[in-house]
Amino acid sequence: MIYFTMFLLGGILGIALWFYLSGFITRLQQNIYAIYVELFPQNRSPFQPHFASIQQKKCGHILRYFFSIGVGFIFLQIAFKDSIFTVWIGLTLIILWTISYLDWHYQLISTTPCLWLLTLGLFGADNNFSLLTLSESIKSAASFFIVFYVIYWLAKFYYGKEAFGRGDYWLAMALGSFIHLETLPHFLLLASVLGICFSLIHRKKKEFLPFAPFMNLSAVIIYFVKYYGY
């Protein structure tokens, strides 16, 4: 019964994820247009999203999300045996995948899922799901944010343009709420190595290499290495 419940919960979350991703750019275009009209009401023009520089991409069939995430929740339940922890870690992985997907396809890290992720990190620390205490989680999140914020401005000053996106330091803050501050150098090194290896293997695939997927993968690896006590 618990496995069916987890499958159904995962499937429902998969459907919610599909709706979020399939309409993300459309909602973004509408928000930008609404802000433009509010700022320049005298220059109001018809809403023409098909002329926008960024367009919504297909994200697969809704049933793929339902079944894949539903089955994923079953495997998480089998692995961890704790239903509440399974839901917590499952939601975390869904948000990580969402951030990675958006950055990969649109070179955009929305602050909204980053704040969701931060909330889950702090919630997990406060309820003993995480490897950190609540105070450690807050300290680590703040430190990750500061370090990446400094890196952002140093890179911008050195290159004369944005080498990192502003979303990177918001994502770093969220990831920092899950892993110890002492692992920050390992986190940076592993994310960079993963990005470099991918770019060397697929050097002609992308002109711009999104960093969020490698940051997320680095955090997941470090978290589970610490979780299993290595």
From Swiss-Prot:
Superkingdom field: Bacteria
Which InterPro entries does this entry report, sorted A to Z?
A: Prepilin_IV_endopep_pep (IPR000045), Prepilin_peptidase/N-MTase (IPR050882)
Pfam families linked to this entry: Peptidase_A24
Keyword Lipoprotein assigned:
no
Sorted alphabetically, the Gene Ontology cellular component annotations on this record are: plasma membrane
Is Membrane found in the keyword set?
yes
**What EC number(s) are associated with this protein in UniProt?**
3.4.23.43, 2.1.1.-
GO annotation terms (biological process): signal peptide processing
Q: Which reaction does it catalyse?
A: Typically cleaves a -Gly-|-Phe- bond to release an N-terminal, basic peptide of 5-8 residues from type IV prepilin, and then N-methylates the new N-terminal amino group, the methyl donor being S-adenosyl-L-methionine
Q: Which family does it belong to?
A: Belongs to the peptidase A24 family.
Report the protein name in the record.
Prepilin leader peptidase/N-methyltransferase
Organism lineage reads as: Bacteria, Pseudomonadati, Pseudomonadota, Gammaproteobacteria, Pasteurellales
User: Which gene is annotated as encoding this protein in its UniProt record?
Assistant: hofD
